[in-house]
């Protein structure tokens, strides 16, 4: 269905209109993006070429870093370009495309983090059956399911807003394409649509986060049965994953699991989960994973 609209493009206000401040932010976000790409690509390459990293956890970690690469690349390059050239205009179709990619890979990451928690549960609570349960085809299937889940979530989000009429104004007080600021510009009642957006994004994030907390509660309880060496190894892998989960889900829940309104703090929170978290994930996993660190040194 063709969208009923008069607006053909939107203007993203970004962080500031001051040219000097824009240049400072340009350097900062360019550095963040370079670090994100280098760190995540290093993990993908290490897992791919290393003979010692053949575990399901390493496979899922490579999948997570690949998602972070695409997710970050859907937002940061345009942000960096806008800060450098000062051209904050984006076409309606490009806005929708970025929105689709954000939700596709953001949703996929939610499901993949659940899969990784299940992998840790099997490894720690059912160690004798781990390789039987987490066979290669099972790992591939779980990864595909994560992507399909993100795809369906993204299709649903886009389908409920694409046909909205946008008659003007076309100025969005944000630095990237986000759902709630867009709903404010629709020249129709968006109350029901806002509830659907919250249910699809916020509710799914909240449920996933609660499931993760429960799973890690079970895992931590099971650590008592392990030897001291086993507890240390399990604690190392679990603590890194829990850190990533908290960094990703807490800001996401704040942004999505609330009424469809915008707040002054939204930009700062959005920077954390769209820019900072993808950059920190490789650092968190490598610092807490001795096997990954050793494999990187052999490259």
UniProtKB/Swiss-Prot annotation:
- One matching Pfam family is 7tm_4
Q: Which SUPFAM superfamilies match?
A: Family A G protein-coupled receptor-like
**Where are glycans found on this sequence?**
6, 87
Span-the-membrane segments of this chain are 24-47, 56-77, 99-118, 138-156, 194-217, 234-256, 268-287
**Residue spans, topological domain Cytoplasmic:** 48-55, 119-137, 218-233, 288-299
What domain of life does the native source organism fall in?
Eukaryota
User: Which residue ranges does the entry give as Extracellular-facing topology?
Assistant: 1-23, 78-98, 157-193, 257-267
| Location in the cell | Cell membrane
One cellular component (GO) term of this entry? plasma membrane
The record's PROSITE patterns line, in alphabetical order, gives: G_PROTEIN_RECEP_F1_1, G_PROTEIN_RECEP_F1_2
Q: How does it sit in the membrane?
A: Multi-pass membrane protein
Swiss-Prot/TrEMBL keywords: Cell membrane, G-protein coupled receptor, Glycoprotein, Membrane, Olfaction, Receptor, Sensory transduction, Transducer, Transmembrane, Transmembrane helix
Q: Which GO terms describe its molecular function?
A: G protein-coupled receptor activity; olfactory receptor activity
Gene3D superfamilies attached here? Rhodopsin 7-helix transmembrane proteins
What this chain does, per the record? Odorant receptor.
UniProt name for this protein: Putative olfactory receptor 4A4
Supply the source organism for this entry. Answer: Homo sapiens (Human)
Q: Which gene encodes it?
A: OR4A4P
């Amino acid at each position: 269905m063709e969208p009923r609209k008069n607006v053909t493009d939107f203007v993203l206000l970004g962080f500031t209109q001051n040219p000097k401040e824009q240049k400072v932010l340009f350097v900062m976000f360019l550095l963040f993006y370079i670090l994100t790409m280098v760190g995540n690509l290093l993990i993908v390459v290490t897992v791919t070429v290393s003979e010692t990293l053949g575990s399901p956890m390493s496979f899922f970690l490579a999948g997570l870093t690949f998602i972070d690469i695409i997710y970050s690349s859907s937002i940061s390059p345009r942000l960096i370009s806008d800060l450098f050239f000062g051209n904050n205009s984006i076409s309606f179709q490009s806005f929708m495309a970025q929105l689709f990619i954000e939700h596709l890979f953001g949703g996929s990451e939610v499901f993949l983090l659940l899969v990784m928690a299940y992998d840790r549960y099997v490894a720690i609570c059912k160690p004798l059956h781990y390789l039987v349960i987490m066979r290669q085809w099972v790992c591939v299937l779980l990864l595909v399911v994560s992507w399909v889940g993100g795809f369906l979530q993204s299709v649903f989000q886009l389908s409920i807003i694409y046909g909205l009429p946008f008659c003007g104004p076309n100025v969005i007080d944000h630095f990237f394409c986000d759902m709630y600021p867009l709903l404010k510009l629709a020249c129709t009642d968006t109350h029901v649509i806002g509830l659907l957006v919250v249910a699809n994004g916020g509710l799914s994030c909240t449920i996933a986060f609660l499931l993760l907390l429960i799973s890690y509660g079970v895992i931590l309880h099971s650590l008592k049965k392990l030897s001291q060496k086993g507890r240390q190894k399990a604690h190392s892998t679990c603590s890194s994953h829990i850190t990533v989960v908290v960094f990703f889900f807490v800001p996401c829940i704040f942004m999505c699991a609330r009424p469809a309104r915008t707040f002054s703090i939204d930009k700062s929170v959005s920077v954390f989960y769209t820019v900072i978290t993808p950059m920190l994930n490789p650092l968190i996993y490598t610092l807490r994973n001795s096997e990954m660190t050793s494999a990187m040194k052999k490259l």
